[in-house]
Design a protein with these regions (language model features):
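Charged, glycine-rich active-site and insertion segments that engage polyanionic ligands
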Residues: 1-53, 71-74, 143-146, 152-334
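Clamp-loader machinery-focused feature within the broader ASCE/P-loop NTPase space
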Residues: 2-129
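Helical "lid/switch" subdomain of P-loop NTPase nucleotide-binding domains
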Residues: 98, 118, 122, 126, ...
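Conserved adenine-binding aromatic site and its adjacent loop/helix in ATP-hydrolyzing domains
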Residues: 104, 136, 159, 163
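Conserved catalytic/switch belt of AAA+ P-loop NTPases
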Residues: 107, 132-149
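Short, surface-exposed loop and linker segments with low hydrophobicity and enrichment for Pro/Ser/Thr
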Residues: 125-128, 135-139, 240, 244-247
Length: 334
């Protein structure tokens, strides 16, 4: 199995969450809308897809999709008419027309006679107009319709959206649940070491099996730390990161900020709050008080704005965008 082929497998560390959802369905207690919240790389969307496949399968075996019925065949080909996947398309935003399509989708009768399911990921990509439009779907659920919103930063969602969804929070799993899975992917590096470097985030650990990804990440973390120490200026920082695309720089900074913020969330256990990765731990030491954490949260929002801007038709100056982000990063500890 290649690294890209885990899209609908049941990830071992999510088995209990899956079984909980199946039990709710079997007891006729399934809510009409769920919000899967947690760090990027935990497999939240993988779980959402797997559960959707189970709900649509006409002949599940041991509470798993059979993989052989007509519904499973349609799902495998990505053409099942009763499953709608909403993700950013030509930009980093989920636009209002995509949500309007959802409104039409839920108003129609199921084409295959079962559930109608909408998966939205990442939900924080909803812009203000699409978020407001989604409220209509959440406020007026139709029978046998399920919405699952997947979010890496649930607090960025409108409070009215969060209040209309049943929240399921996902934390980093124990290493013993992940290491055998990583080893099954035929990686060359030590699974335990990759997981340690990824701070117990499984899909990120799999990504780090690519040695270039580890190197690129270390370079950016070093630049971010030097900025906070005042050892380099913004122009120098941008110059050291010019070798990477702006999209990659933004994604790496989002992961970094997300990790530090997650470390300070009460929902994480003491074990998973510990940042094992040396360079990331050094960065986290700068964010020990509420004011700086609030500033870091604001920086994450600036990253989201930048990601939207570079995907728009306005074609901003990419170097200026990167320098602006480094300025915002430096300002988080002022």
């Amino acid at each position: 199995m290649s690294h890209a082929e885990h899209a609908t497998e049941l990830l071992p560390w999510l088995r209990q969450d899956y079984e909980r959802l199946v039990e709710l369905k079997n007891n006729h207690k399934l809510a009409h809308a769920y919000l899967f919240g947690g760090q990027q790389g935990l497999g939240k969307l993988v779980l959402a897809k797997h559960f959707a496949h189970y709900l649509l399968c006409t002949n599940p075996v041991s509470n798993q999709p059979c993989g052989e019925c007509r519904e499973c065949q349609l799902l495998a080909s990505g053409t099942h008419p009763d499953l709608k996947m909403i993700q950013p398309e030509d930009s980093s935003e989920i636009k209002i027309q995509q949500v309007r399509d959802c409104i039409h989708f839920v108003s129609q009768t199921s084409q295959r006679g079962g559930y109608k399911i909408i998966l939205i990921a990442p939900a924080e990509a909803l812009n203000i107009n699409s978020a407001n439009a989604l409220l209509k779907v959440l406020e007026e659920p139709s029978n046998n319709t399920l919405l699952i919103l997947v979010s890496h930063q649930p607090t960025l969602l409108m409070a009215t959206i969060r209040s209309r969804c049943h929240l399921m929070t996902f934390n980093r799993p124990a290493a013993e649940l992940v290491i055998p899975w990583l080893e099954s992917k035929n990686i060359r590096a030590s699974a335990a070491e990759l997981l340690r470097m990824a701070n117990n985030v499984p899909l990120r650990a799999l990504h780090y099996a690519d040695e270039d990804a580890l190197h690129d990440r270390a370079v950016l973390h070093a630049v971010l730390e030097k900025l906070l120490h005042g050892q380099i200026d913004i122009a120098e920082a941008a110059g050291q990161c010019e070798q990477f695309t702006l999209e990659d720089n933004i994604e790496a900074m989002m992961l970094c900020a997300s990790d530090i913020l997650a470390r300070n969330q009460i929902s994480d256990s003491t074990a998973t709050q510990t940042l094992h990765d040396h360079d990331l731990k050094n960065l986290a030491e700068f964010f020990q008080d509420a004011a700086r954490l609030k500033a870091l949260h604001g920086f994450y929002q600036e990253l989201l704005k930048a990601r939207r801007a570079i995907s728009s038709t306005s074609n901003p100056n990419r170097l200026l965008v990167l320098e602006g982000l480094f300025f915002c990063w430096s300002a988080t500890i002022r």
